[in-house]
Amino acid sequence: GAGFSHEAFGSQAVFRSALMALSHPGRCIPVEHDAELPRHGNAAAAVFLLAMLDADCGLWLSPSLRDSDAAMWLRFHTGCQLVEHAAMAQFVWVGAGDSLPVLQSLRQGSDECPDQSATCVVDVGSLSASADADAQHWTLSGPGIREQATLSVTGLPSDFAEQWAHNHAGFPRGVDLFLATHDQLVGLPRTTRIHTPVEA
């Protein structure tokens, strides 16, 4: 498939959506684009990476994406380098149903250069501000959130909130993460705290 019909405008629109998602953690941000997408991987994740990657970027793909048309599509349109180990990558894309790498095993940046950390994009089944059945339901707090935000997610491992607590505790080091469906992104910068409901 083709990339954006107009590369600069297409990339800028997706970049603005991603910036909005990071500026307002937990908010479901619609992603609009006109790119012809690969068959594999969630569309919002694919166009996010299409906008962000270039020839200097290392990308790690989870097993279901590694040998798919998504890998060839991103390499062709961005020139990115596919890396074998997630710990080497600036960007990590985890397909639906694939195991999430341990967040602390990814590039964490340093106190002096926290921006040298990895950005992780995870395909999920659904994203919603309301409490959905069969979803993990969280309350979020931190910079960019007025008091609290709520988020329901399906398709993440059951220990994700615990992993995220370790990621948050390492600030200013740590990874920033995007959750992606076919048409929405949710940003989770490392400054965001996830609060899980207390079990009765």
Segments the model singles out, each with a brief description of its role:
Residues 1-58, 62-65, 76-77, 183-184, ...:
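N-terminal, charge-rich interaction modules
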Residues 68-187, 191-200:
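Internal, well-folded beta-alpha domain core
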